[in-house]
A protein has these predicted regions:
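Catalytic Walker B motif of ABC-type/P-loop ATPase nucleotide-binding domains
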Residues: 154-158
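Helix-to-loop junction immediately C-terminal to a conserved catalytic motif
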Residues: 49
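ABC ATPase NBD coupling module
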Residues: 66-81
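Conserved ABC ATPase signature
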Residues: 129-133, 137-139
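Conserved ABC transporter NBD signature motif
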Residues: 57-68
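A short, proline-enriched helix->beta-strand linker immediately N-terminal to the Walker B motif
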Residues: 148-152
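Hydrophobic anchor residue at the start of the ABC signature
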Residues: 143
């Protein structure tokens, strides 16, 4: 499984960014995306996820065309896990239901649910509603949900920005194991690569 982005450009705040941007991330690899605040890093992930159409270019996920001049695959058909910076939890359902929302209802889902919940220290919060959670708990819930969908590609926007050192390490260890075991690519936006002491980045992309 790999993600290949060819000659992508996209509009952002009346500017065109990423002109002829090329990215290739292979199976089991991590890529980090850096750049000044407001430069369009999140917009790039939105383009990859299908939440925004690029102006030009092509996106392939394991040889399947997601974007081209003649093809546009809708977000729900891309099998991409996306951890949003603002978490994007469903406000009127519990932590458990948020996590299981994207579950594919396979036999091993219960085991995965238990593993992820324990790894991210969510056991005591499963019956709570999102408004009862701290920013860190919401972030871990969103990460857990994205892993439960068993995606072919994982996108993460500042996934440890609200976490203390212990929980940040727990997230990194779980995600690193998950990406390598499932052999999928992962793209992470971060303002500080030094936060990531448990993840090895194969690719670094700076947007300016």
């Amino acid at each position: 499984m790999s993600i290949n982005i060819k000659s992508i450009s996209y509009s952002f705040k009346n500017k065109t960014l990423g002109s002829c941007l090329d990215i290739s991330v292979e199976s089991g690899e991590f890529a980090i995306i850096t750049g000044e605040s407001g430069i369009g890093k999140t917009t790039l992930l939105n383009v990859i996820a299908g939440l925004k159409k690029p102006d030009h270019g092509e996106i392939y996920l394991d040889q399947k065309i997601l974007n081209s001049e003649s093809v546009f695959v809708e977000p729900e058909n891309r099998n991409i896990g996306y951890v949003f910076q603002d978490f994007a939890l469903f406000p009127h359902i519990s932590v458990t239901k948020n996590i299981l929302y994207a579950s594919k209802e396979k036999k091993d889902d219960l085991l995965l649910f238990k593993k992820f919940v324990e790894a991210l220290n969510l056991e005591n919060h499963l019956n709570k509603m999102p408004y009862e959670l701290s920013g860190g708990l919401m972030q871990r819930t969103a990460i857990c949900r994205s892993l439960m969908m068993q995606p072919s590609l994982l996108l993460m926007d500042e996934p440890i920005s609200n976490l203390d050192h212990e929980n940040a390490n727990a997230v990194q260890l779980l995600v690193s194991e998950y990406v390598q075991k499932r052999n999928i690519p992962c793209l992470i936006i971060s303002h500080d690569i030094d936060q990531y002491n448990e993840i090895k980045f194969s690719k670094k992309l700076h947007i300016s």
